[in-house]
A protein has these predicted regions:
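Cytochrome P450 heme-thiolate "Cys pocket" and heme-binding signature region
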Residues: 421-447
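Cytochrome P450 catalytic-core helices
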Residues: 309-327, 332-334, 442-447
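Juxtamembrane membrane-interface segments of multi-pass membrane proteins
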Residues: 157, 262-267, 321-342
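Conserved cytochrome P450 K-helix E-x-x-R motif and the immediately C-terminal K′/meander segment
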Residues: 50-69, 257, 265, 325, ...
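Conserved cytochrome P450 K-helix/beta-meander segment immediately N-terminal to the heme-binding cysteine loop
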Residues: 396-423
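Cytochrome P450 heme-thiolate monooxygenase catalytic core
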Residues: 106-114, 148-314, 330
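Terminal signal-anchor or tail-anchor transmembrane helices
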Residues: 2-33, 188
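Cytochrome P450 substrate-recognition site 1
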Residues: 34-52, 59-153, 182-191, 207-234, ...
Length: 447
């Protein structure tokens, strides 16, 4: 009898996890149906759909959208996320629901190192500061007059790159790795515009200040791509299974000290035409709006948005041109016709229509951000007829939209000519972000 009791007890303990799993699954399905949430795969208790997110994530989400439709939801631990993959749904997000979706999710790593207490362009909550930062960016940093005034910086850095390539090939054809050269180019352009500094190049390898900055930025790009499990499962929020969070803290302090040094240096030299000095002038007029933390956060955002991203886009553009010699030849003919033997000026860009098509097609196939930066619903809203509850993270799969055969003819092929004749909706091409951010980014890239 005792043996029979032990057997029953073991059986009960064995069945209990299965029963809990079935009950929790049934509860989740009932709750989802009752609330009219977007369709979703079957979720596991606690982790939800985290086990489905295989790299590269934008391709995984594209596969899920083929099964569940252009809008579906995922439970990322304790977070509910909604993924959209169609131009019409993106338009609905950023027109009808633009204010509700203006904020960003709170992640530990992002808050500690990226946001300077949520005062950067990518983290600030919707409100007066949000409007101020966008207004200042549009007027002071991305306006046509501002970009034109800094043209000499971009020309200088391009000439330095051309001389470097000429030196390498002086004895005939030579194999070169363009990506590090493009990183040097884009980093120096941004740094000179922001702080009047050059930290990259063969002549600066032994410069102590330059080396310190390069090490900080290299470490930053390594750690910022890592995932913290506590962001999705709150009970593990303060358990650091790796030294990731501790390293982020240390990196944050080093970066903060370095940026503060740049600001203090500019306080003693107000003559330079830099973004930091522009901010310091605004700080004198409105110190409550333009604190040192806001300036440092803006420096960081500019470095993130304008270095790796632009270098990657340049690398893809050159790869596409080399793999499609007929496109390269057509671009050469346009340059010879419109510019001739003269050096290209920024005023020539409007005449180089085919070159613009090449840029657009490169960004369509290889968007700078395959998944746009996540947004956060500050209140309940509807997208595509489905409820998106307050607290939901919104993910836009730009990569999927820009390769959608319903939107693009022969979407996997590199065809710049498609931008000469075909007409596309406002949200069919979103390589940087929603419409407002796209305007700023395009001004920056073209500048």
């Amino acid at each position: 009898m005792e043996e029979h009791y032990d057997t029953m007890q073991i059986l009960c303990y064995s069945l209990l996890p299965c029963l809990l799993f079935l009950l929790s699954t049934k509860f989740l399905l009932y709750k989802r149906k009752k609330r009219n949430l977007p369709p979703s795969p079957l979720a596991l208790p606690i982790i939800g759909h985290l086990h489905l997110l295989k790299l590269p994530i934008h391709r995984t989400l594209d596969s899920l959208s083929k099964k569940y439709g252009p809008i579906f939801s995922l439970e990322l631990g304790s977070y509910l996320a909604v993924v959209v993959s169609s131009p019409s749904l993106v338009e609905e997000c950023f027109t009808k629901n633009d204010i509700v979706l203006a904020n960003r999710p709170d992640f530990i790593g992002g808050q500690r190192i990226l946001s300077y207490s949520k005062t950067t362009m990518g983290s600030v909550e919707y409100g007066e500061l949000w409007r101020n930062l966008r207004r200042i960016s549009a007027i002071e940093f991305f306006s046509t007059s501002r970009l034109t005034s800094l043209f000499s910086i971009r020309r200088d850095e391009v000439n330095i790159l051309m001389r470097r390539l000429h030196s390498i090939s002086s004895n005939g054809y030579a194999k070169v790795e363009l990506r590090p050269m493009f990183l040097d180019l884009t980093s120096n352009v941004i740094l000179r515009m922001v702080a009047g500094k050059r930290y990259y190049g063969e002549d600066l390898k032994d410069n102590v200040e330059a080396r310190m900055f390069r090490e900080i930025l290299e470490e930053f790009f390594v750690h910022i791509t890592m995932t913290n499990v506590g962001d999705f499962i709150p009970i593990l929020q303060w358990v650091d299974f790796s030294p990731h969070l501790r390293k982020l803290d240390g990196l944050s302090k080093k970066m903060d000290m370095f940026f503060q040094g740049l600001i203090d240096e500019h306080r003693n030299d107000r003559e330079r035409n830099t973004m930091i000095n522009t901010f310091l002038t605004l700080q004198e007029q409105q110190p409550e709006y333009y604190t040192d933390d806001i300036i440092k956060g803006h420096i960081l955002v500019m470095l993130i948005a304008g270095t790796e991203t632009v270098a990657t886009a340049l690398e893809w553009a050159f790869a596409n041109l080399l793999n499609h010699p007929e496109v390269l030849n057509k671009a050469k003919i346009e340059l010879d016709t419109e510019v001739g033997d003269n050096s290209i000026e920024e005023s020539d860009f409007a005449k180089l229509q085919y070159l613009q098509c090449i840029i657009s097609e490169t960004l369509r196939l290889h968007p700078v951000a395959p998944l746009l930066a996540p947004h956060f619903a500050s209140a309940d809203c509807t997208i595509g007829g489905y409820l998106v509850p307050a607290g939901t993270a919104l993910l836009v799969n730009a990569w999927a939209i820009q390769r959608d055969p319903k939107v693009w003819d022969d979407p996997s092929s590199f065809k710049p000519e498609r931008f000469e004749s075909e007409k596309f909706g406002a949200y069919s091409l979103i390589p940087f972000g929603e419409e407002g951010e796209l305007v700023l980014e395009m001004a920056w890239q073209r500048g």
